Each structure stands twice: as structure tokens, then as C-alpha cells.
Amino acid sequence: VGFLNMAGGYEARSRFFKGCIPPKSVSLVKSEDTPSNECLVFEGFMDFLSAVTLGVTGNADCLVLNSVANVEKAAELLDGYGRIGCFLDRDEAGRRTLDALAKRYGARVADRSSLYDGCKDLNEYLQRTTKKQKNNHLKIEEQ
């Protein structure tokens, strides 16, 4: 699977490969409904796709960093939003990225990682949730 970024490069993923076809940059997915005052920020595309699967994106625009090193590239795109929801990894790099965004945007930034407390990221949360649901379904059918 390949996802286009703002510089014309692609973030590529398969079972065997995770990388970028340069140039590397962020990816912006605009809401199809109406112009949005909210942008949700994700570290990678798998977290973004997990958010879509979980139904947490609503009518917000979504910005995928494709690397926390791209936080400065994201800044100019985020300037126009009144609310910025961050679904970043629950690790040191994710915390540094959240801190950098909060320093620039103040109260407009909201940490949304409490949704997946106990997991490294949103994708891990989705995998655990899906696995639990499958196990519960099997238990119900066995009774």
C-alpha cells in the first residue's frame, strides 16, 4: 500500500517493507463533508487507518506526520486550525512531539492518547480490541 505525501513522495507499507519513496513529508487528508476547524494528528498511516476504522475521525481533517521528524513541516499546515487533536505514540518521541505542538499552539492542542491507554499507539489498541471481540464472539458461540 502506498500513501501520497504533500511533497509528492509515498509512504509504502507491506508485510515485508516499511519505508518511503522520497521525498519524505507529511500527508493531509481533508474532510469530504465541510471545511473543518479541527485537525487530528497521527504519527503514521496505520494509526490514521486505525482511527478511521474505530470511527474517531468524525468530520476533522487528518494530518499524518509519517515521522515525528516532520513536526516542523506539519506546523505551517496546522496554523489555520482552531483545534488540534493528537493521537501520537505513547513513547518518548510521541511526548516530545506533543510538547512541541503544545508549545506552539497552546490550548488548541489536545492529547487524545488516553483512548489507547496501556497500548503503544492507536493501531495496537485496535488490534487488541479486535482480538478481544473475536475471542468474546467465539466464547458466545461455544455456549
Residue ranges and their predicted role:
Residues 1-79:
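Phosphate-handling DNA/RNA-contact segment within nucleic-acid enzymes
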Residues 37, 53-143:
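TOPRIM fold recognition
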